[in-house]
């Protein structure tokens, strides 16, 4: 005799083995839930009544507690409602919204539309129907527009919908010149406004837009808000304002001169502006930090893998224009920008000698100069700017006594360059030495993705350096081992693309450096090994690379809002990109 799932008796066959039959009805949970809903509608076995406005909703405590941590806590932790047979939300909850949530609890289905999405998000968060809250947030994401993104930013911040907040914030940054004219803008909290104006991704080529926006916000409620003006001013890139605008602010804006603190801020901005225009040393002031939309894209490359020229990308004309020759052609170097200067570090020269040299290109004055040499000659390394200093990571150096230079094992050593002192110092070495890795900075930390190990294997680790305690940690594993990838940063998101295998060459991923979580994004338009990527505005740009014998001949753009890649322009056949940087576009006099 076989044993049904409902029986507890056991039996054995003649061979002594257990004979069991398990019956499973997949639709049983739906049937039970549907019948409970019928019982609810007929007020059968209900043991609590919810009130919203003037409407009553008889329910089963067990169903509510199973659907919502809010109700589970209410009914089980000795609260008054755990003994009463009614729970009255009064006017804190609209009856139609509560009805929708109860229908979801009893059916697992809910209809979300433009009229109820915001209310469902708020109520779902309040009553801890988190699935409904997240579904409403996803609906609102898909219906974001410049006319509602500020409101969505405020709503999502209040209800811990981080993804909707980032999407809303990103749209507000892209359309800042439009949204700052809306009534929602004047209703922003100080902290939300501060979050917007402090971001590098705010899209404007004229910092006067930001300057005028904060004055507008303060004047909307002058008595309450004037105390916030110094903090807001410190997050405007005042040194990027035209000189006549700064002078006009001093002479014609009484609000700025009414407070000693704001006067000191304006004076500091003037000094910074003068220092830049006179090319008087390195400027690291936050007043002079350009927005990403105020950047230009520079490609370093040549007709061979030996780089000898800088090219500028003209977005509007969709052209790539030669700008300047490198003083010393080289290959396998690294390049990064700090403000208006591009730092070219190390590499190998025409005779394959490994270099310590550091060449600096000033994009404002279009001049080359030499900085202090690195402490270690290296090639195949990575570099990134972090808090106005340059970090050089990993790579190879040459084996002593061998000519031409042969690569050593991958280096662990990391160097830091301070432009103010023109001096290199060693910082803590990496946990694992790597070369050909993707190196970027985000959230005041340095991130190194993959690379080639000391054993010449591909690496799958994400190594992270925190300068505040001079320590490296392993943050996560990459989706697969990587080398010859590109990386670029938008906010707290790091985008990684390309690689040297069939599987990784066209793939792209997003890494959240706050949660250490990976998300696969849309594939690139072509397979790219040794490509180069930068962020500008709220988009990513990728150039160069090859796969097999095929060179990639396009400059492509990724829009994270739509998760799509598009070709911007073709790269001249005579240009093989070796590095790609984003630096100041212009400095208004």
UniProtKB/Swiss-Prot annotation:
<feature type="repeat" description="Kelch 1">
    <location>
        <begin position="296"/>
        <end position="340"/>
    </location>
</feature>
<dbReference type="InterPro" id="IPR011333">
    <property type="entry name" value="SKP1/BTB/POZ_sf"/>
</dbReference>
<dbReference type="Pfam" id="PF24981">
    <property type="entry name" value="Beta-prop_ATRN-LZTR1"/>
</dbReference>
<dbReference type="Pfam" id="PF07707">
    <property type="entry name" value="BACK"/>
</dbReference>
<feature type="repeat" description="Kelch 2">
    <location>
        <begin position="341"/>
        <end position="388"/>
    </location>
</feature>
<dbReference type="Pfam" id="PF00651">
    <property type="entry name" value="BTB"/>
</dbReference>
<dbReference type="InterPro" id="IPR017096">
    <property type="entry name" value="BTB-kelch_protein"/>
</dbReference>
<dbReference type="InterPro" id="IPR015915">
    <property type="entry name" value="Kelch-typ_b-propeller"/>
</dbReference>
<comment type="subunit">
    <text>Component of the BCR(KLHL25) E3 ubiquitin ligase complex, at least composed of CUL3, KLHL25 and RBX1.</text>
</comment>
<keyword id="KW-0880">Kelch repeat</keyword>
<dbReference type="GO" id="GO:0006511">
    <property type="term" value="P:ubiquitin-dependent protein catabolic process"/>
</dbReference>
<feature type="repeat" description="Kelch 5">
    <location>
        <begin position="493"/>
        <end position="538"/>
    </location>
</feature>
<feature type="repeat" description="Kelch 4">
    <location>
        <begin position="446"/>
        <end position="492"/>
    </location>
</feature>
<feature type="domain" description="BACK">
    <location>
        <begin position="149"/>
        <end position="250"/>
    </location>
</feature>
<dbReference type="InterPro" id="IPR006652">
    <property type="entry name" value="Kelch_1"/>
</dbReference>
<feature type="domain" description="BTB">
    <location>
        <begin position="46"/>
        <end position="114"/>
    </location>
</feature>
<dbReference type="InterPro" id="IPR000210">
    <property type="entry name" value="BTB/POZ_dom"/>
</dbReference>
<protein>
    <recommendedName>
        <fullName>Kelch-like protein 25</fullName>
    </recommendedName>
</protein>
<comment type="pathway">
    <text>Protein modification; protein ubiquitination.</text>
</comment>
<dbReference type="GO" id="GO:0016567">
    <property type="term" value="P:protein ubiquitination"/>
</dbReference>
<dbReference type="GO" id="GO:0006446">
    <property type="term" value="P:regulation of translational initiation"/>
</dbReference>
<dbReference type="GO" id="GO:0045717">
    <property type="term" value="P:negative regulation of fatty acid biosynthetic process"/>
</dbReference>
<keyword id="KW-0810">Translation regulation</keyword>
<feature type="repeat" description="Kelch 6">
    <location>
        <begin position="539"/>
        <end position="585"/>
    </location>
</feature>
<dbReference type="InterPro" id="IPR030565">
    <property type="entry name" value="KLHL25_BTB_POZ_dom"/>
</dbReference>
<comment type="function">
    <text>Substrate-specific adapter of a BCR (BTB-CUL3-RBX1) E3 ubiquitin ligase complex involved in various processes, such as translation homeostasis and lipid synthesis. The BCR(KLHL25) ubiquitin ligase complex acts by mediating ubiquitination of hypophosphorylated EIF4EBP1 (4E-BP1): ubiquitination and subsequent degradation of hypophosphorylated EIF4EBP1 (4E-BP1) probably serves as a homeostatic mechanism to maintain translation and prevent eIF4E inhibition when eIF4E levels are low. The BCR(KLHL25) complex does not target EIF4EBP1 (4E-BP1) when it is hyperphosphorylated or associated with eIF4E.</text>
</comment>
<dbReference type="InterPro" id="IPR056737">
    <property type="entry name" value="Beta-prop_ATRN-MKLN-like"/>
</dbReference>
<dbReference type="GO" id="GO:1990756">
    <property type="term" value="F:ubiquitin-like ligase-substrate adaptor activity"/>
</dbReference>
<dbReference type="GO" id="GO:0032831">
    <property type="term" value="P:positive regulation of CD4-positive, CD25-positive, alpha-beta regulatory T cell differentiation"/>
</dbReference>
<keyword id="KW-0677">Repeat</keyword>
<feature type="repeat" description="Kelch 3">
    <location>
        <begin position="389"/>
        <end position="444"/>
    </location>
</feature>
<dbReference type="GO" id="GO:0046321">
    <property type="term" value="P:positive regulation of fatty acid oxidation"/>
</dbReference>
<dbReference type="GO" id="GO:0031463">
    <property type="term" value="C:Cul3-RING ubiquitin ligase complex"/>
</dbReference>
<keyword id="KW-0833">Ubl conjugation pathway</keyword>
<dbReference type="InterPro" id="IPR011705">
    <property type="entry name" value="BACK"/>
</dbReference>
